[in-house]
Amino acid sequence: MGPILYCILACMSFHANVNVCHIFLQMWRPTEAKVYLPPVSVSKVVSTEEYVTRTNIYYYAGSTRLLAVGHPYYPIKDTNGKRKIAVPKVSGLQYRVFRIRLPDPNKFGFPDASFYNPDKERLVWACAGVEVGRGQPLGIGTSGNPFMNKLEDTENAAKYIGGNIADSRECMSVDYKQTQLCIVGCKPPLGEHWGTGTPCGTQNAGECPPLELKNTTIQDGDMIDVGFGAMDFKALQANKSDVPIDISNTICKYPDYLGMAADPYGDSMWFYIRREQMFVRHLFNRAGTVGDAIPDDLMIKGTGNTASPSSCVFYPTPSGSMVSSDAQIFNKPYWLQKAQGQNNGICWHNQLFLTVVDTTRSTNFSVCVGTQSTSTTAPYANSNFKEYLRHAEEYDLQFVFQLCKINLTTDVMTYIHSMSSSILEQWNFGLTPPPSGTLEETYRYVTSQAITCQRPQPPKETEDPYGKMTFWEVDLKEKFSAELDQFALGRKFLLQLGMRARPRLQASKRSAPSSSSTAPKKKRAKRI
């Protein structure tokens, strides 16, 4: 500002042209710094503890022994040609997403219902404790591909092969990354994986497609990340030989912990327990034309076999290492005191979702069946036997629920409606529609055939938002019990609270003998 003012005064002092001075004034501009306005106030998401009142009433609920048996690599279709699944795919590398159905506490029969007012309050369940029981012994399951894309052993290379082989695929098997996971919430968990994105222009054949991070709901039966990445192998690997056959035609998902932690209501993940471990067992490279060629300034080519470089697409085979009972997260109780989100364990819509992954019990059974009656004296032949693979899983789910009540004030109902309007509909609350401004018609003879049919429309059924998804349904509507001391998890919960169960059997006191049957007491003689 100082030099500009000096130039203006200098021009005026030497009788300069007025237009020149006008140009000097046009060159000066005010500051172009951005002005930041305060953000617009938005509605605040509050914790459920601010409008939910907890009672001292607890209930235990447990499932039956849950079993699943199937083929560990792929589903077996029916041989009748109806394309029905005869044997489902059941693998230790799948997500088990249980949808737990709970009874409506507002329709529950309580011995003493004086603790709440049904005209002004509504009841909800809060998850206080959970224990996931796992049966079957510890074991490691393997998978592989009879045509695995393996060119060279890059860890212990015997000789330089190069990329001149037409088909170098081999039969290989691996053991996967070790994962133990348990996620609890009232909505299904959210997963993430890498898939094919949308290119900006025309994409030629053989070009690498753009990648896009996609978020989808984790359903029961989805494959976990086994060590080859969370990606859509069906869309991104056309040769179906880069990974084992159980994931070569599907999607491996990884839980979106960041997205679920950022959920303002925290319904998808109240808390989670996770344990993962992996190390690299072998190092190989893949056959095929390298799409992104190595720059010439990064290497010096040789002669003979080293005239052209071999494939630089290196990859490892994962391994989960040893499994041990010392590092188990299952078969032990977990108590929910404070959730990581705003929902502190409230089971909206009388349901909760329990997601389980356990690769430490992924043993695959080998079942051998003779094709014909064979005797021990006949020579052994491979064609006389058929080999089958099966995998079995065993679960036992136990919960402790706390009864809570919500005071139906105007602010609370408005907040719950903004969070999920279906909750109020489930409580038999509806919004009155505004009066219509149009003139409606009303016929007198509603049964007359001279007018259009006046049959009332049936009420619209409530649509299940998860009706088209796949979950393991577990109905606990008739499994609730107030006698916590009669169950293992209930006794652990009472011990954790420092409470004791009420004694059921009281020792009977002996009745005092009648005065007629008692002998008179002798007076003690005084000593002199």
UniProtKB/Swiss-Prot annotation:
GO terms for cellular component: host cell nucleus; T=7 icosahedral viral capsid. Keywords: Capsid protein, Disulfide bond, Host nucleus, Host-virus interaction, Late protein, T=7 icosahedral capsid protein, Viral attachment to host cell, Viral penetration into host cytoplasm, Virion, Virus endocytosis by host, Virus entry into host cell. GO terms for molecular function: structural molecule activity. Residues 508-519 have a biased composition (Low complexity). Residues 504-528 are annotated as: Disordered. The keyword Disulfide bond applies. Its main location: virion. Transmembrane segments: none annotated. The keyword Transmembrane does not apply. One of its GO terms (biological process) is endocytosis involved in viral entry into host cell. It comes from the Viruses. It is found in: Virion; Host nucleus. Belongs to the papillomaviridae L1 protein family. HAMAP family: PPV_L1. Self-assembles into homopentamers. The capsid has an icosahedral symmetry and consists of 72 capsomers, with each capsomer being a pentamer of L1. Interacts with the minor capsid protein L2; this interaction is necessary for viral genome encapsidation. Interacts with protein E2; this interaction enhances E2-dependent replication and transcription activation. Forms an icosahedral capsid with a T=7 symmetry and a 50 nm diameter. The capsid is composed of 72 pentamers linked to each other by disulfide bonds and associated with L2 proteins. Binds to heparan sulfate proteoglycans on cell surface of basal layer keratinocytes to provide initial virion attachment. This binding mediates a conformational change in the virus capsid that facilitates efficient infection. The virion enters the host cell via endocytosis. During virus trafficking, L1 protein dissociates from the viral DNA and the genomic DNA is released to the host nucleus. This is Major capsid protein L1.
